[in-house]
């Protein structure tokens, strides 16, 4: 079973540092989890992930279930040996994919029936099946099946998704207990953009006593301030001693703000996806490497960055690679963006431990105003 120890609590905010201990190692929080949808973080190897100081990565249950499938995963001993990753893995339940591929999915009391986007075959995810598949994957942290509601949504729609999510959470938890509490299962708070519904969801899930909790249904098209409002409202409703995870978020600014609200875990495709689109994150903000201003620029992407890319290559060379659509561009850009995100979390942890989180936050924004 997972253990979570709170190391330091900021006196200036709800920010805190912690330590999650799993069967595959320790995770220092707050932490960002690179997304490896299909058992790979696109464009980089596990060795490069480790060099970027990745402590835990995320796998996608929906996609891995469809390809390569449970038979292959079971035969190979799970996702860890399959991809040669010996550190913790978190897997989602498929709920967000059913939301994003809504035309292919139907929500029922039993679970979610859906059509494969690969070959059109029909499948059913029940709360029990979602836990079973994640157990086959060997996830250190599994997510309960949830109903993610988009934005905007009516109160009636949000309430329906909340009720279904709670019912599924209880069923998934019961199955997890029957199977011997293999690995760890988190519940997911829903409730749309209605604070009172999120309070209800949080209380219901807290009563089920999961090892940790995710706050879902954010970053689904709502304004940033509304996302912050919902997160700020929800975090205190959940057990203080349990890790809290905001799913699918987000920008560097999002991470700083939400960590200040007491969020411990984050994931997002942004650093890797944006790297492939030429958008790079630096201590002074974002840059588009295709910009003509970098054609003769001999400087690194970020003078403050110690990543492999910044230590070895110029902006001019990286621009050339990207404009030429050379595959190396995607690798070097992704290494930099992941290093930036993970180093940002490292800096945050240090600041919280040293009692200067607010000073860190002010400096973070000051650099972006240059």
Curated annotation (Swiss-Prot):
Record-level GO cellular component terms: cytosol
Keywords: Glycosyltransferase, Metal-binding, Queuosine biosynthesis, Transferase, tRNA processing, Zinc
Pathway(s) the chain acts in: tRNA modification; tRNA-queuosine biosynthesis
UniProt-listed GO biological process terms: queuosine biosynthetic process; tRNA wobble guanine modification; tRNA-guanine transglycosylation
Reactions performed catalytically: 7-aminomethyl-7-carbaguanine + guanosine(34) in tRNA = 7-aminomethyl-7-carbaguanosine(34) in tRNA + guanine
Superkingdom of source: Bacteria
Pfam families per record: TGT (PF01702)
Binding site residues for substrate: 92-96, 146, 190, 217
Entry cofactors: Zn(2+)
Residues that hold Zn(2+) according to the record: 305, 307, 310, 336
Enzyme class: transferase
Enzyme Commission number(s) from the entry: 2.4.2.29
Co-factor note (free text): Binds 1 zinc ion per subunit.
InterPro entries tied to this protein: ArchSynthase1/Queuine_TRR, TGT, TGT-like_sf, tRNA_ribo_trans-like
Positions of the UniProt region annotated as RNA binding: 248-254
Assembly mode: Homodimer. Within each dimer, one monomer is responsible for RNA recognition and catalysis, while the other monomer binds to the replacement base PreQ1.
Function: Catalyzes the base-exchange of a guanine (G) residue with the queuine precursor 7-aminomethyl-7-deazaguanine (PreQ1) at position 34 (anticodon wobble position) in tRNAs with GU(N) anticodons (tRNA-Asp, -Asn, -His and -Tyr). Catalysis occurs through a double-displacement mechanism. The nucleophile active site attacks the C1' of nucleotide 34 to detach the guanine base from the RNA, forming a covalent enzyme-RNA intermediate. The proton acceptor active site deprotonates the incoming PreQ1, allowing a nucleophilic attack on the C1' of the ribose to form the product.
Family per similarity comment: Belongs to the queuine tRNA-ribosyltransferase family.
Protein name: Queuine tRNA-ribosyltransferase
Source organism of this protein record: Desulforapulum autotrophicum (strain ATCC 43914 / DSM 3382 / VKM B-1955 / HRM2)
